[in-house]
């Protein structure tokens, strides 16, 4: 399941890395003005494409909870029992994708179970992720059982979870060490753009008390972990400009635990 806006740069690789591991794709194009919708329409795995009217960044209104509700209802129309969520600028590690169906089989089918993954922000390079401070403690619930009732009344409109209300209140969360890698933290320019976007959307820090400056900060405490060969994602699915990013300085690398 994909919610996207102006992701023509990262979307082709995202679809490539999911293909063959999921049974189908339901997507919502949130008013894109680039080629995002055209890329989705060409995808053989696409079951349904939802859309919002095109809008420029100055006038676009983010309605994340409504988008999520529409996506989950579409997934249910297509017979989905379990949902895997992915952003266009994210890549699941190959180990997780190989184990995906076994992971679903291992979770309780009669309860609103969900699986959380470690969220790894790639930093300055496609082969290293940031692990100091809040960066080393991020996790995301991205695989979950689809509930009968789909609502997001208790979720914030920005940075809210993908889990519907019933799953948050009554479900069981299982925490895994599988990894989800974020691509738009590789380049400094992308980190600054992300910081500026969220600062504009949430100037009073209503949805995140820590604010957003940290998204682009480094400092002397910067610590990176190189991705082990058996924990990698499919780097062939990176956009060309990110494939060319440099490897990290050895002085900021820490030994990565399994």
Regions found by a protein language model. Name each.
Residues 29-42, 53-56:
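A conserved acidic beta->alpha catalytic loop
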Residues 65-82:
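Active-site nucleotide-sugar/metal-binding loop of Leloir-type enzymes
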């Amino acid at each position: 399941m994909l919610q996207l806006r102006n992701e023509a740069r990262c979307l082709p690789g995202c679809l490539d890395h999911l293909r063959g591991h999921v049974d189908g794709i339901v997507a919502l194009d949130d008013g894109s003005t680039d080629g995002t919708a055209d890329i989705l329409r060409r995808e053989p795995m696409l079951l349904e494409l939802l859309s919002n009217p095109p809008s420029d960044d100055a006038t676009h209104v983010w309605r994340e909870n409504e988008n999520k509700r529409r996506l989950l209802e579409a997934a249910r129309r297509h017979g989905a029992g379990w949902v895997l969520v992915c952003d266009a600028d994210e890549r699941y590690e190959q180990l997780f994708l190989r184990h995906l169906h076994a992971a679903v089989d291992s979770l309780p089918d009669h309860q609103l179970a969900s699986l959380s993954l470690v969220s790894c922000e790639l930093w300055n390079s496609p082969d290293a992720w940031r692990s100091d401070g809040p960066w080393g403690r991020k996790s995301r619930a991205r695989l979950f059982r689809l509930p009968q009732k789909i609502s997001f009344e208790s979720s914030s409109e920005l940075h809210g979870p993908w889990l519907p209300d019933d799953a948050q209140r009554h479900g069981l969360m299982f925490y895994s060490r599988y990894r989800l890698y974020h691509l738009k933290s590789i380049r400094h320019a992308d980190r600054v753009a992300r910081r500026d976007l969220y600062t504009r959307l949430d100037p009073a820090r209503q949805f995140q008390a820590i604010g957003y400056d940290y998204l682009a900060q480094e400092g002397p405490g910067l610590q990176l972990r190189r991705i082990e060969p058996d924990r990698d994602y499919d780097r062939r699915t990176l956009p060309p400009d990110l494939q060319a990013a440099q490897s990290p300085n050895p002085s900021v690398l820490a030994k990565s635990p399994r």
